[in-house]
Amino acid sequence: AKATVISIEIEDGGKKKIVISDNGQGIEKDDLNNAFMPHATSKISKVEDLDTIHTLGFRGEALASIASVCHIYASSKTENDEVGHSIRIDGGLFSEVNEVARNKGTTIEASDLFYNAPVRAKFLRRSKIEESEITHLVEKFMLAHPEISFLYVVDGKQIYNTISSELSD
């Protein structure tokens, strides 16, 4: 939340690796584990909140689903934390939360997609097609959020590096 810079890196159409980093508020140490639990969300505390949500991912399903079929490394640091914290999740199995040196914000790395679900892996399209779909999604986010700087890297090659601007600029 409240990020001004977002970095997205993918390898092999996202099948080998996807890394997303931001300089936002970060995730509290105690919430780092919870972020990957099914139905975990910080966006709903009462029924009325359902009518006022204007963001993606409020149901708490995405991270838990992804963590069940790949290797996850997540690290985060809030402004109030002296050090950051990290966790590894392998196919839904959680490690302990550890301390890590990092700047404020969050990084989530997902690697080896469907390593433990080969039947699901067969439904992935060719890497170039998956890459194209991800690129199209990143472009939509860049256009929808000019106030955020985006870095987008595909297989080690920088594709986009935008500079944030206000709509009035």
What are these regions (language model features)?
Residues 1-169:
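N-terminal phosphate-binding caps/lids of nucleotide- and nucleic-acid-binding domains
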